[in-house]
């Protein structure tokens, strides 16, 4: 009898063509769909399929709501294969009887591949799974400010529940071409080398790339801390709400970062989204989308946000892990073929909206970690091609004490110069080119001692400018402080100051300006440009001060 039933189901499977199978699945009753599916899985999971066949032999009907529920065929490595759930959507949340949640990633003819958000040890074979009907959505709004949440929007800082009035889908489509506007407002990071040479605009995507331990997070964190000077005011147009997404980092690192933000009074305007190293790969994959979703709320309400993805290498690794376990075909470096789309659909959500769409903006600072300075690897080249420029940090410079360790030659901002303040553009226009020339000359100068006067002067000034661009961590500067300093360096007023005393000169000069010449800084702030009169005054003040400093 059992053999006859098996023969019947074999005939039924043979009768379906490739197209007929889909039509039968949609049109025929649930039982025939089960017939077509179960035999396909017979080799993979004989126990579960034979139990389904046994039910059919005994004349037991499958439960009528098979479209809404399913049964676990196999589970392991954070992946569950589920039979049933015919109507499930891609990336829909499902709930297992054990309470574990998962997300449907692979929708196949006979089964659904589900990635688990919790431990797979809690899920058993044969367990029932039910649809929730929800695609991953997260709470958004100003209520999140000052909080730490996980990839699904649940609070993890022990400060109680978050009462958000609105929820949004984590993976929304990026805005089209028409609602956008070109970048025209600056994001001040407070770092001399960034604001002068690789300026960032609101709505831009600027990549921070470098080896491990080169200060990538420090650059992003300084940018957050520098927003305090505007965010403590009431002008909504100048405020920049910050979202920091930690992917695959140690919990101790995230805790230290939150502590730093709290100590510097920056947590008031910041939101931290954390999917740490100990969490499941699907959560590390989702966290950047959650961060982008939170930032988009401000963008779409005419406000401005800055989202830091730290780092997207770990997101790509988590996505690779999920894809390989779901048996999707691997490509270069074993990443799936759509890993480029993973990052492009995320970073395209950063935009400057035009006036009719509220004029808000979302700026993205993705972080990528390289191996041994290799920027030609798969993920680094992908993200470099998606973003509007990159800040390249070099371990060699970092160990020499040049911090932030920005390689001027390889760092570029493709759209930020349009947003740079006029005063900064006036003084720093030639700075990047000069420093790139200096690095080139310095490399050759090691070979020969016979150098002409012009080369010696380039080396002399280059050393001082490099020293001037050094900056301590967590001490961002205002633009009206940077402009006089860079003006002094570029115009050769520091050529006579010993290199070892440059940072001392900087501290003393800023103190002198604040005490004795506050109107210079006030004028730079107010006008945003350097007039002929102001330039003459600056020259006079710098020369007088440098004489007394050296005297």
Curated annotation (Swiss-Prot):
<dbReference type="GO" id="GO:0045259">
    <property type="term" value="C:proton-transporting ATP synthase complex"/>
</dbReference>
<keyword id="KW-0496">Mitochondrion</keyword>
<keyword id="KW-0813">Transport</keyword>
<dbReference type="InterPro" id="IPR038376">
    <property type="entry name" value="ATP_synth_asu_C_sf"/>
</dbReference>
<comment type="function">
    <text>Mitochondrial membrane ATP synthase (F(1)F(0) ATP synthase or Complex V) produces ATP from ADP in the presence of a proton gradient across the membrane which is generated by electron transport complexes of the respiratory chain. F-type ATPases consist of two structural domains, F(1) - containing the extramembraneous catalytic core, and F(0) - containing the membrane proton channel, linked together by a central stalk and a peripheral stalk. During catalysis, ATP synthesis in the catalytic domain of F(1) is coupled via a rotary mechanism of the central stalk subunits to proton translocation.</text>
</comment>
<comment type="subunit">
    <text>F-type ATPases have 2 components, CF(1) - the catalytic core - and CF(0) - the membrane proton channel. CF(1) has five subunits: alpha(3), beta(3), gamma(1), delta(1), epsilon(1). CF(0) has three main subunits: a, b and c.</text>
</comment>
<dbReference type="GO" id="GO:0046933">
    <property type="term" value="F:proton-transporting ATP synthase activity, rotational mechanism"/>
</dbReference>
<keyword id="KW-0547">Nucleotide-binding</keyword>
<feature type="site" description="Required for activity">
    <location>
        <position position="411"/>
    </location>
</feature>
<keyword id="KW-0066">ATP synthesis</keyword>
<dbReference type="Pfam" id="PF00006">
    <property type="entry name" value="ATP-synt_ab"/>
</dbReference>
<dbReference type="InterPro" id="IPR000793">
    <property type="entry name" value="ATP_synth_asu_C"/>
</dbReference>
<dbReference type="GO" id="GO:0005743">
    <property type="term" value="C:mitochondrial inner membrane"/>
</dbReference>
<keyword id="KW-0999">Mitochondrion inner membrane</keyword>
<dbReference type="InterPro" id="IPR033732">
    <property type="entry name" value="ATP_synth_F1_a_nt-bd_dom"/>
</dbReference>
<keyword id="KW-0472">Membrane</keyword>
<dbReference type="InterPro" id="IPR004100">
    <property type="entry name" value="ATPase_F1/V1/A1_a/bsu_N"/>
</dbReference>
<dbReference type="InterPro" id="IPR000194">
    <property type="entry name" value="ATPase_F1/V1/A1_a/bsu_nucl-bd"/>
</dbReference>
<keyword id="KW-0067">ATP-binding</keyword>
<dbReference type="InterPro" id="IPR005294">
    <property type="entry name" value="ATP_synth_F1_asu"/>
</dbReference>
<keyword id="KW-0375">Hydrogen ion transport</keyword>
<dbReference type="InterPro" id="IPR020003">
    <property type="entry name" value="ATPase_a/bsu_AS"/>
</dbReference>
<dbReference type="GO" id="GO:0005524">
    <property type="term" value="F:ATP binding"/>
</dbReference>
<keyword id="KW-0406">Ion transport</keyword>
<keyword id="KW-0139">CF(1)</keyword>
<dbReference type="InterPro" id="IPR023366">
    <property type="entry name" value="ATP_synth_asu-like_sf"/>
</dbReference>
<dbReference type="GO" id="GO:0015986">
    <property type="term" value="P:proton motive force-driven ATP synthesis"/>
</dbReference>
<dbReference type="Pfam" id="PF00306">
    <property type="entry name" value="ATP-synt_ab_C"/>
</dbReference>
<comment type="similarity">
    <text>Belongs to the ATPase alpha/beta chains family.</text>
</comment>
<keyword id="KW-0809">Transit peptide</keyword>
<dbReference type="GO" id="GO:0043531">
    <property type="term" value="F:ADP binding"/>
</dbReference>
<protein>
    <recommendedName>
        <fullName>ATP synthase subunit alpha, mitochondrial</fullName>
    </recommendedName>
</protein>
<feature type="binding site">
    <location>
        <begin position="210"/>
        <end position="217"/>
    </location>
    <ligand>
        <name>ATP</name>
    </ligand>
</feature>
<dbReference type="Pfam" id="PF02874">
    <property type="entry name" value="ATP-synt_ab_N"/>
</dbReference>
<dbReference type="InterPro" id="IPR027417">
    <property type="entry name" value="P-loop_NTPase"/>
</dbReference>
<dbReference type="InterPro" id="IPR036121">
    <property type="entry name" value="ATPase_F1/V1/A1_a/bsu_N_sf"/>
</dbReference>
């Amino acid at each position: 009898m059992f053999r006859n039933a098996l023969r019947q189901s074999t005939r039924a499977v043979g009768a379906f063509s490739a197209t007929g199978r889909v039509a039968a699945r949609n049109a025929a009753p649930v039982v025939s769909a089960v017939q077509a599916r179960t035999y396909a899985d017979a080799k993979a999971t004989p126990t579960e399929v034979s139990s389904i066949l046994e039910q059919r032999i005994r004349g037991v009907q499958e439960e009528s709501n098979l479209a809404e529920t399913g049964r676990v065929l196999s589970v392991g490595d954070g992946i569950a294969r589920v039979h049933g759930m015919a109507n499930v959507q891609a990336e829909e949340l499902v709930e297992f009887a054990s309470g574990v949640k998962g997300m449907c990633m692979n929708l196949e003819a006979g089964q659904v591949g589900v990635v688990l958000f919790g431990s797979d040890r809690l899920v058993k074979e044969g367990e029932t799974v039910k649809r929730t009907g929800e695609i991953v959505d997260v709470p958004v709004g100003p209520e999140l400010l000052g909080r730490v949440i996980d990839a699904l929007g649940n609070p993890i800082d022990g400060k109680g529940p978050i009462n958000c009035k609105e929820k949004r889908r984590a993976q929304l489509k990026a805005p089209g071409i028409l609602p956008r506007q070109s970048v025209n407002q600056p994001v001040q990071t407070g770092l001399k080398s960034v604001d002068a040479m690789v300026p960032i605009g609101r709505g831009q995507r600027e990549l921070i790339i470098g080896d491990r331990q080169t200060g990538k997070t420090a650059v992003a964190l300084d940018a957050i801390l520098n927003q305090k000077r505007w965010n403590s005011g009431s002008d909504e147009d100048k405020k920049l709400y910050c979202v920091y997404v930690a992917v695959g980092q140690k919990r101790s690192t995230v805790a230290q970062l939150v502590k730093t933000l709290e100590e510097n009074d920056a947590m008031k305007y910041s939101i931290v989204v954390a999917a740490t190293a100990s969490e499941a790969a699907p959560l590390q994959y989702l966290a950047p989308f959650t961060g982008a979703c939170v930032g988009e709320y401000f963008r779409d309400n005419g406000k401005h946000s800055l989202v830091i993805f730290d780092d997207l290498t770990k997101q790509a690794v988590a996505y690779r892990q999920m894809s390989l376990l779901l048996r999707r075909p691997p490509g270069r470096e074993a990443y799936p073929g759509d890993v480029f789309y993973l990052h492009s659909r995320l970073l395209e959500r950063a935009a400057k909206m035009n006036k009719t769409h509220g004029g808000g903006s979302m700026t993205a600072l993705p972080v990528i970690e390289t191996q041994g300075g290799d920027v030609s690897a798969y993920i680094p080249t992908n993200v470099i091609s998606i973003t509007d420029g990159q800040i390249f940090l070099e371990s060699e410079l970092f160990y020499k004490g040049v911090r932030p360790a920005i390689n001027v030659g390889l760092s570029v901002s493709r759209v930020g110069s349009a947003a740079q303040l006029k005063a900064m553009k006036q003084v720093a226009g030639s700075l990047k080119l000069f420093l790139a020339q200096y690095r080139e000359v310095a490399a050759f100068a090691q070979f020969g001692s016979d150098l002409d006067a012009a080369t010696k002067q380039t080396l002399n000034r280059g050393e001082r400018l490099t020293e001037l661009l050094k900056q301590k961590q967590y001490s961002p500067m205002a633009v009206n402080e940077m402009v006089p300093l860079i003006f002094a360096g570029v115009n050769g007023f520091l050529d006579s100051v010993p290199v070892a005393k440059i940072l001392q000169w900087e501290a003393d000069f800023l103190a002198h300006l604040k005490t004795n010449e506050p109107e210079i800084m006030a004028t730079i702030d107010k006008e945003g440009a350097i007039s002929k009169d102001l330039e003459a005054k600056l020259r006079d003040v710098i020369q007088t001060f440098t004489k007394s400093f050296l005297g």
